[in-house]
């Protein structure tokens, strides 16, 4: 199955055919660095990180460009409030962004350009637009003339006349059309500025991305991504600028991730339901947040709530618990790298063997269907269930069963590398989650282990009543015991 991508421009899933065979160019709009990133930023960046990883996994040489908008009204306002230079603000929050993304396990893009490093390219594109009649200078500002570009608004499917008729646009005598947008803003007293043919000033937001994407990916490239909120006006304006300047298609596949709601409501500072990544990671493990994001299709809205985060953590615990059990069974054993041909397997082993044989093809089938990470995780959970059944049935390991367990670990490492998941040592990850949960409980891990040991001794002595009492006591405290041939483990419910 060929990779198909939902293209906002066509409204359909289009087969991915890169501009240059074997290569893929992708540009994703980065953050405006004036504050800490919120969970909406987490979703966008995790989504396109997985797309970047999967393209590479599929054999493409990927050039991934994700920019920083490091000059903007919001940055200037923040600098004025704090009485510092705008670069102090931008550098502070670029560093904070990088820290947040590292905690979420993101791979570094190929290039991370900053707008202020590309003023020459920005000015050059604006000059071209003026020369071609698509832009005009007005009192030190430069505006894009939207009526000069007949296909304006084709990405969002809007109608310019309808927008003008229903718009509440502030009258601006410097504009020929109320919908015209700024390419260059003349400088104001006390604001940072750069020299240009139209006087000192700074670029508009939209032209920055056009210039930076052209520099690193060319006049036409494969994939442009961002949140749905960027379709209009940002991406619409990027198309108008870039195609008018270059006379060719700008982007072949437009991708947009869905919104993040908070307890079924739109995230908003005014509603008091605005959460930064840092605030969320004070309560939840970074991999749990990543798993939560990937548990839904990237185009669907997701509802951020404690219940849904706890459900995501429980799902991730199921996978890590399975992998920890596999590690325990293989510990100290000579594990064959290849299946042992002709060796007998118990019924659950035959089922597991069958699941593993098709796992990669089914994983790829899900990911090739517009990067359906929710379906891909479903394939992995099937393998977890089959592995757990096999582990419950198996006694002493044989070369054939050990080879099967080794295959489980290799396949989860392979798929996990694509998703940016399962990167921790399973036992250590589970222990850290237990510790975080137990910090909020009335019973310590040491006390739990003592009771488990007492229960084991009681069962050895055939005192099953006492064993059941201990199990029920722990259950009342939210501790669930899990018995297996390898011993007894526990989870916090």
Swiss-Prot record:
Q: Name one GO biological process term.
A: cysteinyl-tRNA aminoacylation
- EC primary class: ligase
Q: Which residues bind ATP?
A: 269
- Supply the InterPro entries for this chain: Cys-tRNA-ligase (IPR015803), Cys-tRNA-synt_Ia_DALR (IPR015273), Cys-tRNA/MSH_ligase (IPR024909), Rossmann-like_a/b/a_fold (IPR014729), tRNA-synt_1_cat_dom (IPR032678), tRNAsynth_Ia_anticodon-bd (IPR009080)
Q: Where is it chiefly localized? A: cytoplasm
The intrachain disulfides are: none
Q: Which reaction does it catalyse?
A: tRNA(Cys) + L-cysteine + ATP = L-cysteinyl-tRNA(Cys) + AMP + diphosphate
Q: Which GO terms describe its molecular function?
A: ATP binding; cysteine-tRNA ligase activity; zinc ion binding
The organism's superkingdom is given as: Bacteria
Chain sites annotated for binding Zn(2+): 29, 209, 234, 238
Note on how the cofactor is bound: Binds 1 zinc ion per subunit.
Query: What EC number(s) does the entry state?
Result: 6.1.1.16
Fill in the subunit field for this protein. Monomer.
HAMAP family in the record:
Cys_tRNA_synth
Q: What is this protein called?
A: Cysteine--tRNA ligase
Organism field: Pelobacter propionicus (strain DSM 2379 / NBRC 103807 / OttBd1)
């Amino acid at each position: 199955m060929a990779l198909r991508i939902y293209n906002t421009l066509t409204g359909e899933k289009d087969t991915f055919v890169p501009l240059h065979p074997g290569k893929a160019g992708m540009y994703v709009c980065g953050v405006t660095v004036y504050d800490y990133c919120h969970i909406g930023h987490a979703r966008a960046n995790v989504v396109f990180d997985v797309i970047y990883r999967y393209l590479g996994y599929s054999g493409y040489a990927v050039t991934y460009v994700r920019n920083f908008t490091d000059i903007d009204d919001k940055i200037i306002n923040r600098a004025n409030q704090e009485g510092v230079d705008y670069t102090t603000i931008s550098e502070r929050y670029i560093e904070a962004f990088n820290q947040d993304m590292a905690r979420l396990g993101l791979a570094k893009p190929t290039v991370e350009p900053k707008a202020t490093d590309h003023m020459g390219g920005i000015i050059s594109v604006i000059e071209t637009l003026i020369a071609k009649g698509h832009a005009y200078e007005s009192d030190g500002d430069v505006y894009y003339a939207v009526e000069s570009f007949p296909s304006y608004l084709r990405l969002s499917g809007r109608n310019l006349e309808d927008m003008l008729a229903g718009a509440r646009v502030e009258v601006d005598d410097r504009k020929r059309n109320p919908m015209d947008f700024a390419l260059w803003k003349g400088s104001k007293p006390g604001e940072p500025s750069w020299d240009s043919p139209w006087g000192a000033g700074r670029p508009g937001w939209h032209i920055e991305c056009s210039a930076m994407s052209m520099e690193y990916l060319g006049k036409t490239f494969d994939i442009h991504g961002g949140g749905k909120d960027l379709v209009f006006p940002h991406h619409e304006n990027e198309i108008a600028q870039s195609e008018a300047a270059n006379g060719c298609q700008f982007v072949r596949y437009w991708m947009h991730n869905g919104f993040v709601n908070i307890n079924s409501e739109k995230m908003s500072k005014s509603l008091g339901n605005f959460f930064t990544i840092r605030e969320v990671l004070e309560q939840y493990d970074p991999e749990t947040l990543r798993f939560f994001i990937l548990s839904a299709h990237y185009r669907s809205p997701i509802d951020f709530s404690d219940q849904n985060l706890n459900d995501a953590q429980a799902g991730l615990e199921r996978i890590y618990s399975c992998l920890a059990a596999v590690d325990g069974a293989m510990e100290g054993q000579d594990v064959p790298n290849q299946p042992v041909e002709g060796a007998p397997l118990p019924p659950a082993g035959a089922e597991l063997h069958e699941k593993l044989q098709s796992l990669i093809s089914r994983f790829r089938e899900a990911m090739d269907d517009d990067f359906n990470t929710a379906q891909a995780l479903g394939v992995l959970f099937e393998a977890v269930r089959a592995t757990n059944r096999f582990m419950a049935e198996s006694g002493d390991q044989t070369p054939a069963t050990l080879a099967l367990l080794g295959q489980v670990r290799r396949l989860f490492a392979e798929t996990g590398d694509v998703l940016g998941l399962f990167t921790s040592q399973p036992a250590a990850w589970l222990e850290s989650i237990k510790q975080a949960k137990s910090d909020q409980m009335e019973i310590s891990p040491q006390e739990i282990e003592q009771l488990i040991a007492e229960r084991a001794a009681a069962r050895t002595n055939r005192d099953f009543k006492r064993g059941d009492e201990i199990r029920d006591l722990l259950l009342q405290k939210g501790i669930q015991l899990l018995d297996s041939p390898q011993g007894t483990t526990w989870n916090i419910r």
